Amino acid sequence: MYKRQAYRFSFSWPRLYPNQDGKINSLGLEFYDKLLDTLQEKNLLPFATFYHWDLPKYLDDKGGWTNLDTLKRFSEFSNLIMDKFGKRIHSIATINEPWCVSWLSHYWGEHAPGMKSIEATAKSMHNILLAHGNAVEIARDYGHKNVGIVLNKTHVIPQSNKKEDAFAAKIYDEIHNTWFDEAIFKGKYPINLLSILRPYMPKNYSNDLKIISKKIDWIGINYYT
């Protein structure tokens, strides 16, 4: 029988901060304390994700990932996790699939908040990466040395050899793949997509790229067939 060595889970933001007053839910802390105790008893390494899409409703009502206040609150949430549980977590993923949080949710409208807005898309595509960078910094401040992010990838092929199809494929590759890769690993955004999104991006977005590109230890890949 295959012996499991690790358990991947996410911290639920609404469970720990159920209300907008910022008060911490002690029962939520107790839940994760017991979970980590159980994992230790079972000799399972905790692989924790800070954000796997469960945004508190009170933040969604104020614009969610298009609102900079959400980033401030996410940093508070990340700091709480590290303060209470950081030494007991083997591996940290800051964000699960930021493409889903941004493009899929704000341009295609298939996930919450179900928007179809290019402006909201541009802001969320940048802000979710800035939230990642802030979380990396927080984890480093607590001395953690096993920090990464999980990205979902897709293979893009032009429909034909026509120039317009090749360009369309390039744009979609930047939307789904290289927007996140280049920001995280190179501290820049791919030029073609940026030329489209720049009018809608947050002011002074380029100043954030140093934070977004903070060194990480690994990258997780989700690839669906």
Which role does the model predict for each range below?
Residues 1-5:
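Conserved small/polar residues in nucleotide/adenosyl-binding loops
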Residues 6-8, 220:
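Short hydrophobic-acidic sequence motifs that mark active-site Asp/Glu residues
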Residues 11-26:
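Glycine-rich, proline-tolerant flexible connector loops at the mouths of alpha/beta enzymes
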Residues 19-20, 33-225:
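Active-site region of glycoside hydrolase catalytic domains
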